[in-house]
Regions:
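N-terminal secretory signal peptides that target proteins for export/translocation
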Residues: 1-15
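Sec-dependent signal peptide recognition
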Residues: 7-8, 17-25
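Compositionally biased, intrinsically disordered low-complexity regions
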Residues: 12, 19, 280-282
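Cleavable N-terminal signal peptides
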Residues: 25-26, 36
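N-terminal signal peptide c-region/cleavage motif recognized by signal peptidases
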Residues: 32-33
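Transmembrane beta-barrel domains of Gram-negative outer membranes and organellar outer membranes
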Residues: 38-292
């Protein structure tokens, strides 16, 4: 009888250990990230998320990045509020090359009149030429086309080219952007929006700026600051200067959040702004069956 009792006790202990091992394995499987490419998305700065000056790196090949409604709110010194919203999706279509589609939306106050609607269709291609070396920064080129789609869009299409450089040191990264936009000035003042929203909403003849950021890998977040100047499409307007700062945080292996604030230092739209956005990284294996 004693032997039987001991055997039952040993069987119970073995069963408990097996259940514990199974539960632990299941928990690890559930908690393990399924999309490794999204784990460092906080480290890659995109235009408008949360600053306009971006780095020279692109979305991984065969990976998608869904930018979930990056929002920018501006308040001018005159008390007018402007909203910018541009949902985007990017695809790493080739090695070191991404394509991106965005639909900028605008909510503006002009002369006491509120207007809202689609401000265009933004198509872009970005290519990263190289990884950084001891003597050469990472370099990239982006080409954009803003199509005249929507009731708040310009009356013609605009194309632009942007050169990007990124240099990394042990204590910080530095980025330099320079952009030029081709095309005549808009015929209507409403189309020549000076709303400095994410992406296509900030249409200017030229743009030049620099940014610095610092990453904290153990906490999965990054802080950044920028300063840039932009010349409006209207040649009669002076160059506008803006300073801003922000942060990006990796909430999960596939989801990153960002936020920032800053101030336009001069110009007719002088005032402050805040931004908030998120990005979800994922892949669709069925679309790329041969990818590894």
């Amino acid at each position: 009888m004693i032997t039987t009792t001991i055997r039952r006790m040993l069987s119970t202990v073995a069963l408990q250990r097996a259940m514990l091992s199974t539960s632990s394995a299941l928990a690890l499987a559930l908690l393990a990230p399924t999309e490794a490419h999204g784990q460092t998305d906080y480290y890659n700065t995109d235009r408008g998320r949360p600053v306009q000056v971006e780095d020279a790196y692109v979305t991984e090949r065969h990976a998608f990045e869904l930018k979930l409604a990056p929002v920018r709110l501006e308040r001018t010194n005159g008390g007018a509020y402007n909203w910018g919203l541009e949902p985007e999706i990017a695809l790493g279509i080739l090695p070191r090359t991404q394509v991106e589609l965005g639909v900028p939306l605008a909510f503006m106050e002009q002369g006491g009149v509120r207007r809202s609607g689609i401000a265009g269709l933004d198509l872009s291609v970005m290519h990263n030429f190289n990884v950084e070396t001891e003597g050469l920064p990472a370099l990239a080129l982006r080409a954009d086309v803003l199509a005249p789609v929507g009731n708040l869009a310009a009356d013609r299409a605009y194309s632009s080219l942007t050169g990007i450089a990124t240099r990394t040191y042990s204590w910080a990264r530095f980025h330099v952007n320079g952009q030029y936009t081709f095309g005549a000035s808009p015929a209507s003042s409403s189309a020549a929006t000076t709303l400095g929203g994410p992406g296509a909403l900030d249409v200017s003849r030229w743009f030049a700026g620099a940014a610095i950021d610092k990453a904290y890998p153990l906490s999965s977040y990054l802080v950044t600051a920028e300063f840039y100047g932009r010349k409006p499409l209207d040649s009669s307007q002076a160059v506008e200067y803006t300073a801003g700062t922000g942060t990006r945080f990796q909430l999960s292996p596939t989801l990153a959040l960002d936020g920032g604030f800053g101030r336009r230092l001069n110009g007719p739209e002088q005032g402050w702004y805040v931004t908030f956005g998120s990005a979800y990284a994922f892949s669709i294996p069925a679309l790329f069956p041969g990818a590894r």
